[in-house]
A protein has these predicted regions:
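Extended, histidine- and acidic-residue-enriched regions that form the cofactor-binding/catalytic faces
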Residues: 1-166, 172-280
Length: 280
């Protein structure tokens, strides 16, 4: 008989965590004070300037002799996934790329501090895939789906050839179905041993992007593209790339009955994720 799943309640009846290592970690963060959160961020060196051009931070900025030694100790490589996309007049179009790289740079700094440094690869997609309703959006550059998939497949193949057996995409953009398809096609095509996965980091911490009166956040809406929550993360990581004087208050309009499609992080548990349909 399967073991019954246990849940960890919070001070908000709508928020609970699974009684698992991941759920217990999230519950600990949920209950942490602002001072404790600041200490955790300090452990990861967040905020810090972008390290895309810093020696020793990425595979591509590290002497090969040193990178080989690093990989022999830890063959996990994180691959940041971003894009070039309109995020409103107040934000930079490279927001997704800078957000995910600077988060992962914090992970690398922390793992180096504890003596088990992971590796980071340069973002393979500075321009990404997009849904149909993004066509014609100024500031957004759209690549064909097959280009996205094949770019990711051959990125994985090159990293595998270099000895990395645990390749993890960390996605900061909405083209998740393309990443999933790339991983499955890579495994079918080459049938190589390893662990290959993609993580939607926003969904991974969806509870913290859900408005609540009990946990001290001031969000009016759950996380969605270019909103107050995403902007707040940008202000933490790269404040000088944002111009809040140009920010505009705006609300989406639904053309279907309410309750059909969910938001970016599926926080409402609705029947369909946002990407499971198109039309006009």
């Amino acid at each position: 008989m399967a073991q019954k799943v246990k849940w960890l309640a919070t001070d908000d009846p709508a928020i609970m965590f699974e009684d698992s290592p991941v759920g217990r970690m999230k519950k600990e963060l949920w209950d942490a004070s602002d001072e404790e959160i600041d200490k955790i961020l300090l452990d990861y060196g967040i905020p810090s300037l972008s390290e895309l051009g810093k020696a020793g931070s990425y595979i591509q900025t590290t002497p090969r002799s040193k990178q080989i030694e690093k990989r022999r100790k830890n063959d996990i490589v994180f691959v940041p996934i971003g894009c070039t996309e309109n995020h409103g007049k107040h934000a930079n179009s490279g927001l997704d790329t800078f957000m995910v790289t600077q988060i992962l740079e914090g992970v690398r700094r922390y793992t180096a501090k504890i003596g088990d440094e992971c590796s980071l690869a340069f973002p393979p997609l500075l321009y990404g895939g997009h849904p149909y309703h993004h066509i014609g959006m100024p500031g957004t550059v759209i690549l064909p789906e097959e280009v996205v998939k094949e770019t990711l497949i051959y990125t994985m193949l090159g990293l595998w050839d270099d000895g990395y057996r645990k390749i993890i995409f960390i996605n900061n953009h909405g083209h998740c179905w393309m990443l999933e398809a790339a991983i499955h096609e890579f495994c079918k095509r080459y049938q190589l041993p390893g662990i290959f996965r993609t993580v939607e980091w926003h969904r991974s911490v969806r509870e913290f992007f859900t408005p609540t009166d009990t946990n001290g956040n001031d969000f009016d809406t759950p996380f969605i593209h270019a909103d107050e929550a995403e902007t707040a993360v940008g202000m933490l990581l790269f404040n000088d790339m944002l111009d809040m004087s140009a920010a505009e208050e705006a609300w989406p309009t639904s053309y279907l009955f309410e309750g059909q499609f969910d938001t970016s992080i599926d926080c409402y548990r609705r029947p369909s994720s946002w990407s499971l349909g198109e039309g006009h």
